[in-house]
Each structure stands twice: as C-alpha cells, then as structure tokens.
C-alpha cells in the first residue's frame, strides 16, 4: 500500500512539474546531501526549480535538508525562498516541523511555526509525537505553547506520553503530564505509557505513570489522508496559475 501511495503521489508531483527533469531533481538532491547551499541556490534561481516538489527519495527539498542536517542550505537558501510552503510533508507524511522536533532544533521549529507550520497536522504522527520520541523536553514545551494537542493519537492509539515514556525521558514525561497528558490512554494492544517505560527498563517512570486500568473508549483523532492532501495542494497550484494574484 505504501509503495502504491508513493507511486501515485510521485506521478502527481511529476505531472505538476513536467518541465523539471529527473536529472535536475537528482542533482538537487545530491547538492542538499553535500550541504552545497550555493549550488542549491543556483538550481532554484537558474533552473527555476520549485522548492515544494518531491525529490527522487520522496522528500521535499526542505524536509531532506533538515533530515540530512544541511542547515547552511536550510537557513541561507530554503527558508528565504519566497515560494516555500513549510506545510508540505514528505511522501512518508513527515513535515519539516516534525523533523525539527525529533532533532530538538528549537530555533528552526520557531521559524517554521512563524512561517505557518501546522503544529497539529497529523498524517499518522504529529510533531509532538516526534519530539517525545527523542525526549526533547524543550521542544515539547515549545510545541505545547503553540497549541499542540497533548493527547493526540496515531491510528494505533499511541500518544506523545507513550512515546516519551518509551524514550525513558522523565523530563519529557513530566512536561506532558503538566500540560494534561492522560496516562490512561493505552495503545490498540492495551499497552499503557507505564508499560512502555517498564519494557524499556525504567521502573521509576513506570511507577510514576502507573494506572489501575486503561481508558476503554477509543480516542478520536483527525488523521489526514496524505493522498488527498497532496491532491489539494496540486489543485491549489493549478487554480493560482489560472488566476494569478494582481
């Protein structure tokens, strides 16, 4: 199913950007890997490459640059591009904010939020899940301050608190609890945050999160269909092309 999704979205991207050759896309991806900001700037400027389409690996240029720690390219080129859309995820459903979150890059996350990144967008996981997964307390607090849903769930009912417990980060666990995280929300297999901590060898965190029973009702969460989201972006681009701003 994932392979089909990637193929479908790749076709959408290729259709919308037919003038961009696979060779040029690969060249851009390689320049990002080298953190060659000058070359990336050249490709955007001289080849008129759109910063929002997909590279051969399924990432947008910004997502890939953050993933590979090409921060010179991110800060000097990509974040300054007037056409950049920081909301566009990779074909895996990972947004730039999610990758900034898991890396604990608070400055980058603040910039992305200022530029319009959606703190609660959920293609399966949220930025708060990612921050909790790597025990990023400062990032967790930043996201919560900007309206992150503390009890957001994945399709398998995994919460940020569950991920923080799994990362064995007491500071992250406490930051989420202070914000109202519900420790009785268990995943779809009935595993609680306390169980997750115990499985990772932390009896202290497990005891801290101990509950008598899991919450029985399934938690509702709006998980966005990635295919439909990308289609809506493409339709928006088409409408803008037909009705350019004055």
Please report, for each region that a protein language model flagged, where it lies by residue:
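Ankyrin-repeat-protein effector appendages
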Residues: 19-27, 146, 179, 188-191, ...
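Ankyrin repeat A-helix N-terminal signature
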Residues: 30-35, 64-71, 99-105, 130-136, ...
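Ankyrin repeat boundary/linker residues
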Residues: 55, 88-90, 121-123, 154, ...
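N-terminal segments that cap or nucleate solenoid repeat domains
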Residues: 20-64
């Amino acid at each position: 199913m994932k392979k089909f999704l990637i193929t479908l979205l790749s076709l959408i991207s290729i259709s919308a950007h037919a003038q961009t050759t696979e060779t040029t896309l690969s060249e851009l991806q390689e320049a990002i890997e080298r953190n060659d900001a000058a070359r990336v700037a050249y490709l955007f400027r001289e080849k008129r490459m759109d910063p929002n389409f997909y590279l051969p690996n399924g990432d947008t240029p910004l997502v890939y640059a953050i993933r590979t720690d090409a921060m010179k390219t991110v800060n000097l080129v990509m974040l300054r591009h007037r056409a950049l859309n920081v909301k566009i995820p990779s074909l895996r459903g990972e947004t730039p904010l999610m990758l900034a979150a898991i890396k604990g890059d608070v400055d980058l996350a603040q910039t992305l939020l200022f530029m319009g990144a959606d703190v609660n967008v959920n293609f399966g996981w949220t930025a708060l899940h990612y921050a909790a997964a790597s025990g990023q307390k400062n990032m967790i607090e930043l996201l919560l301050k900007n309206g992150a849903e503390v009890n957001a769930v994945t399709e398998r009912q995994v919460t940020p608190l569950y991920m923080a417990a799994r990362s064995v980060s007491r500071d992250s666990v406490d930051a989420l609890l202070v914000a109202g995280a519900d420790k009785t929300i268990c995943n779809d297999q009935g595993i609680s945050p306390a169980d997750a901590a115990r499985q990772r060898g932390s009896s202290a965190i497990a005891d801290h999160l101990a509950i008598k029973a899991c919450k029985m009702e399934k938690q509702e969460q709006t998980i966005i269909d990635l295919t439909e989201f990308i289609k809506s972006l493409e339709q928006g681009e088409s409408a803008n092309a037909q009705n350019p701003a004055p």
